[in-house]
């Protein structure tokens, strides 16, 4: 039965990824150790959900962090693979049956991972700022992977951060950032300060130093443009 399931999974990957992509997608390789790791992660998530474990419990946040780190590794750090896997999970009932990863599991992990970040931001933000972030963090969360995939592509293609395309990407990033950080420059500075000091905040973002550097150049150009020529 297990080889039949493996065959079925391989067929599914063939439907969603090109042969070239499959060669670099760790998930598509049949690796016993990786399969075992995911089996344990899913089993742990199911157990915590059965126990009605709150998303902000230490064990839930620790599991979500391990899950996201493994996911980033097994998608070869490529956010476009993540968006495709999400679509594949939503469209293929057999995928959910074989992996045991249900929409409820994903929801639990997403919330627990968010709580792990909110716990850090709580050290930098005041009560009002934190309440705003907590209230709005999930508003546009699902838009991030597609944006990060576009940022990776722009960086890979060596697009000029100050170009029209670069500025459009910077505007999209700023809109998503402000959706949970608000528009107060003083508050936004607290987020930037925290992100520079707390490695955990960069986990599960699929952002590399090169992509981050490109984005900083693009947002810098956007800010200069918004300020207009110096008087």
What are these regions (language model features)?
Residues 1-231:
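Amphipathic alpha-helical "stalk" segments
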